[in-house]
């Protein structure tokens, strides 16, 4: 069992925390020392953050080793905030502060009048409190209405009256978020949204390490690591961020979306809530891949605003909605397992349409139409990646002769599979392509994958109600590879 932490200044001086190398150590030096130790151990640098091992993380490490303030530039859903929160794992497990201090005063070098008076009065009997790493992380979303008082502080007449202080007394100050983040990490998200005069207020903190409260000549020598996030377009646009502030940010680091479907699936599996503690959930591999590829297709779609980006949250919420639709079906039908189908992606359209911002051309046809196209293209890309293009001539001929097929989204696995078995050659084509899998759920997903791929290539059509039918013949010279909407 570890020894209890000191509770008074005298006990703190006699403990290892009172050693000469611990006194006056800045938070940047603390993070640097812990980061070097983690690098030497070879463990994961930032637990829970995936895909940045060879790109972003080395740059973040360099910034921290250089004791820089830094900014993460990237589109939404690129784990910028997650990465900043992971910095707390580089802080010491416990930090001593003067009990009751609003500015987390160092017992050996207090910066506030409260801290100095407390030590002058109590001496070695000054009570000591301890902060955990999470208590030393302060995060703020920048908005145009954020004021200098919010970040730095203001004179508080009510506090002065209650304490019997003059307004000129430092004890009448109501501290903002930055002083309260002293000896910790302060993260400001969406920096360009901060008003220019408030950005000016950050200058001294970044350059000199101190702040001034209004016109009162109090200077607080803050010890804080400043981190920021921003959208690259906003960050570089003139007028969004003032040049002197940008010049004071030590490192500018660009984030990105997952570079491969396999990596993206790993992230989605980590973040999505699929193990629900009720009926067992088994997601066919092709269904999970199609769901993941929807985001990749969206990032290539010209009718979607790529300056806004397509968040990784799209894949996460999409998979959760897919599982929920399958869960509802399994409960109603009394099935022993929750087995999602590709058809469930269409029931999860709200998870897609709510995550994309459309260009003018996209607004004309609507988000739902584009979302359906993304699903079909994702299915086609999945099939091509796994087995290459499939002609499925018998299947196409059957539909071209006027036949149609509609399998209810609420049908169970056995019923749906029976419906797909009426299409000549479909099950054989799926098995021949190696899409049959281990059970009927995989076989069903393989059937849907083939049909959706044929729809994407305009060899079949799929109505909004889910009915597959023959393709509408197009004029010679028109593309037959990419869908443009529901037939």
For the regions a language model picked out, list residue spans one by one.
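Charged, amphipathic alpha-helical linkers/stalks
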Residues: 357-400
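C-terminal helical "lid" subdomain and adjoining coupling/linker elements of P-loop NTPases
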Residues: 277-284, 297-371
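Amphipathic alpha-helical core segments of compact helical bundles
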Residues: 65, 69, 88, 296, ...
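Conserved ASCE/P-loop NTPase catalytic core
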Residues: 2-262, 273-289, 302-306, 383-487
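Short alpha-helical scaffolding segments that buttress acidic/His motifs in well-ordered protein cores
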Residues: 268, 291-295
